[in-house]
UniProtKB/Swiss-Prot annotation:
Within the IPP (ILK-PINCH-PARVIN) complex, binds to F-actin, promoting F-actin bundling, a process required to generate force for actin cytoskeleton reorganization and subsequent dynamic cell adhesion events such as cell spreading and migration. GO terms for biological process: cell-cell adhesion; cell-cell junction organization; cell-matrix adhesion; cholangiocyte proliferation; chordate embryonic development; establishment or maintenance of cell polarity; hepatocyte apoptotic process; integrin-mediated signaling pathway. It is found in: Cell junction, Focal adhesion; Cell membrane. The lineage of its organism: Eukaryota, Metazoa, Chordata, Craniata, Vertebrata. This is LIM and senescent cell antigen-like-containing domain protein 1. GO terms for cellular component: focal adhesion; plasma membrane. The modification N-acetylalanine is found at residue 2.
Length: 325
């Protein structure tokens, strides 16, 4: 053993070992105690903990900064298993159903209106609009189209027109707490909502050549009422400003709002002039400033120079690879 150590050399400095010197053995590799350090910061490993990547050893902090992705939910670095979903990275325990909070890592998920849902929740959401109504008078299932009276569903044949006495159909109209057949109702000159096809007794919205209940004149994308705010029309549908521009115009990558005025086009994205800034120090940038892309966001030259050397090498290599494509 003594003869073996006499001929052994330090893996880092290639120097020999003194007879009584303390030696660090890491997976068969021998080091002087002062040579067993992080490849990035050259400091000894706290509590002996290190991470190895491509033959180099790093302390936990530098390994996270250089190689570990950040969790979209908690913002912490991910060491170990990474879930890649919805264009983001997640800890397995952080990737949960948006409705019931069930962990999705091992059971799979379904995209639903921008949400990640477990299959039971997705199926319930999908089936919500497929269920049949129950008559609030006889409590039997309504197989055909229901008559909605005071926000409750009924079989139409339970009612008669308050004017002519005819048995009603699902086309009946409610006015001031009474039900009327369609011909009798139309003779009263009451406006009909373009969405629900029911009479409008209160405020009327006149738009797109039709009349609407205030709460029924909504954005075709988010279904929120306009409530007097400006709407934008396209192919017979109305959109709020945000979703009209999101679907047919420019939305700022940073603030996710409609870009009013000049658009900064950089990194294959659109930005408000006031939002285009260094993602590290928030210094405002223009296209005349020098900046680099990091995590799909701009970083000014001053902040870039403070990056660890290994990280800058990675970014340069990535930039050269993309430039050749």
């Amino acid at each position: 053993m003594a003869n073996a150590l006499a001929s052994a050399t330090c893996e880092r400095c290639k120097g020999g070992f003194a007879p009584a010197e303390k030696i660090v053995n890491s997976n068969g590799e021998l080091y002087h105690e002062q040579c067993f350090v992080c490849a990035q910061c050259f400091q000894q490993f706290p509590e002996g903990l290190f991470y190895e990547f491509e033959g180099r050893k790093y302390c936990e902090h530098d390994f996270q900064m250089l190689f570990a992705p950040c969790c979209h939910q908690c913002g912490e670095f991910i060491i170990g298993r990474v879930i890649k979903a919805m264009n983001n990275s997640w800890h397995p325990e952080c990737f949960r159903c948006d409705l019931c909070q069930e962990v999705l890592a091992d059971i799979g998920f379904v995209k639903n209106a921008g949400r990640h849902l477990c299959r039971p929740c997705h199926n319930r959401e999908k089936a919500r609009g497929l269920g049949k109504y129950i008559c609030q008078k006889c409590h039997a299932i309504i197989d055909e189209q229901p008559l909605i009276f005071k926000n409750d569903p009924y079989h139409p044949d339970h009612f008669n027109c308050a004017n002519c006495g005819k048995e009603l159909t699902a086309d009946a109209r409610e006015l001031k707490g009474e039900l009327y057949c369609l011909p009798c109702h139309d003779k009263m000159g009451v406006p009909i909502c373009g969405a629900c096809r029911r009479p409008i007794e209160g405020r009327v919205v006149n738009a797109m050549g039709k009349q609407w209940h205030v709460e029924h004149f909504v954005c075709a994308k988010c279904e929120k009422p306009f409530l007097g705010h400006r709407h934008y029309e396209r192919k017979g549908l109305a959109y709020c400003e945000t979703h009209y521009n999101q679907l047919f115009g420019d939305v700022c990558f940073h603030c996710n709002r409609v870009i009013e005025g000049d658009v900064v086009s950089a990194l294959n994205k659109a930005w408000c002039v006031s939002c285009f800034a260094c993602s590290t120090c928030n210094t405002k940038l223009t296209l005349k400033n020098k900046f680099v892309e990091f995590d799909m966001k701009p970083v000014c030259k001053k902040c870039y120079e403070k990056f660890p050397l290994e990280l800058k090498k990675r970014l340069k290599k990535l930039s050269e690879t993309l430039g050749r494509k």
